[in-house]
Amino acid sequence: PEGIFRALEMSRIPVSLDPFLPRALDRRWEGEYSGDDLPRLRAASPDGAVISVRVAFTLARGPLGEIRWQAEIEGETDQVCQRCLQPMRWHFRLQPDIALIRPDDRPSALGEDAERLELGADGLLWPAAAVEDEILLALPLAPRHEQCSAGGHREFEPGEGDREAENPFAVLGQLRGKS
């Protein structure tokens, strides 16, 4: 007999799935993606970047009856350090927990700031696209090595422009005193 805890079935990640089917709920999906599977991430990475992503997710019913995509996304990709302009590896670990919304649904019970993913017109979840969205949202705007020797030197030497400028309103004060 099953207890109150239901064992999660584990499966490979499909290309697409209907998250609202009962058989999709409470099942653990696992797999890996490369740059070939994530074209937008490949485009946002330097040429020849090595992209490896490991994903595990479940579809579960939330407290308000909504279907939630709960994922663990871990991986790494090449980036260019914006301080020294040398290649670097960017490691990431993401744990999105997002309500899935049908195209014709607008559940107000979730609240305005609840994170949600509106599914396409077909009503299907495309896991690779959802994973790619999360990685692109987490991608650093200006990636940098943690210990980067660049940036410690001054590009310009102190010069004439660094001296303290005279107050332009001092002349007005002098004129006011004369009247």
Language-model-detected regions and their locations in the chain:
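A positional/architectural concept
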Residues: 2-78
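Residue-level signal for pocket-adjacent positions within structured domains
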Residues: 33-36, 83, 112-114, 120
